[in-house]
UniProtKB/Swiss-Prot annotation:
Record function comment: Catalyzes the formation of N(7)-methylguanine at position 46 (m7G46) in tRNA.
Annotated residues for binding of substrate: K154, D186, T223, R224, F225, E226
Gene3D superfamilies in the cross-refs: Vaccinia Virus protein VP39
Organism in which the protein naturally occurs: Xylella fastidiosa (strain M12)
UniProt name for this protein: tRNA (guanine-N(7)-)-methyltransferase
Active site: D150
Length: 244
């Protein structure tokens, strides 16, 4: 079964699915599309051909996709796109791939990218596991970023968390040697699970040492919700792993 996750871990229907694909999906969760504004709907019509990548289930040459050879950065579950948009504005030497299944977030980022005149960002509105398995070659990525995945705070729901051993192994395959994996969470027990999983995954080494964390890197913008939480004493864990 596909593991369809938005940036906050909510399973939702991705845009490219056909009716037959929806019928054969076995789901044990409530689907949520959220509030889709007219502007976000127009963004799909006007800007998807420019920034969007339709899932075809075949490996892609990423240099051909972007029309140049540059380091490739993937953000899984970009939410409303704030971090991805910020990175594209401030690190134009990179090519960015974003994956998100929550349609309003994709629409919002499409509008933002068009406003910025971005040329080095491509978006999937699809399942990240499927994209990684079928469209991105092993060793093709220089960085993978996953920010604030849903913590599924109830213990009985921990199995739904994105960061699991099989997924971590998949990420390692897609990173080139010398690349890095950056994750952020504001849930202590999810940080513990991330350490448990990633420290046990061959090919990954914590840059800050065993069960270590790093300050928020310059490439990740802090959201107003994050800043508000920190003002209330909430912690954020930034985990940075090197691919070896």
């Amino acid at each position: 079964m596909m593991n369809l996750l938005s940036s906050d871990g909510v399973q939702v229907l991705p845009r490219p699915f056909t009716l037959n694909e929806r019928r054969r999906e076995v789901r044990s969760f409530v689907l949520r599309q959220g509030h889709f504004t007219p502007a976000q709907k127009r963004a799909f019509d006007h800007y998807w051909p420019r920034f969007g990548v339709d899932f075809i289930g075949q490996l892609r040459d990423l240099d051909v996709l972007f029309g140049r050879s540059a380091p490739k950065v993937l953000e899984v579950g970009f939410g409303n796109g704030a971090a991805l948009r910020f990175a594209a504005q401030h690190e134009p030497r990179y090519d960015y791939i974003g994956i998100e299944v929550y349609a309003p977030g994709v629409g919002r980022l499409l509008n933002g990218l068009a406003e910025d005149g971005s040329r080095h960002v491509r978006l999937y509105h699809y399942d990240a596991v499927e994209v990684l398995n079928k469209e991105i070659a092993d060793g093709a990525l220089d960085e993978i970023r996953i920010y604030f995945p849903d913590p599924w705070h109830k213990k009985r729901h921990h199995k739904r968390r994105l960061i699991q051993p099989l997924f971590a192994t998949l990420l390692v395959r897609k990173l080139r040697v010398g690349g890095c994996l950056h994750m952020a969470t504001d849930w202590a027990d999810y940080a513990e699970q991330m350490w448990d999983v990633l420290d046990a995954t061959p090919g990954l080494v914590n840059r800050a040492g065993l069960r270590g964390q790093v300050p928020c890197p310059d490439w990740r913008v802090q959201t107003r919700f994050e800043r508000r939480g920190q003002n209330l004493g909430h912690r954020v864990w930034n985990l940075l792993y090197d691919r070896v």
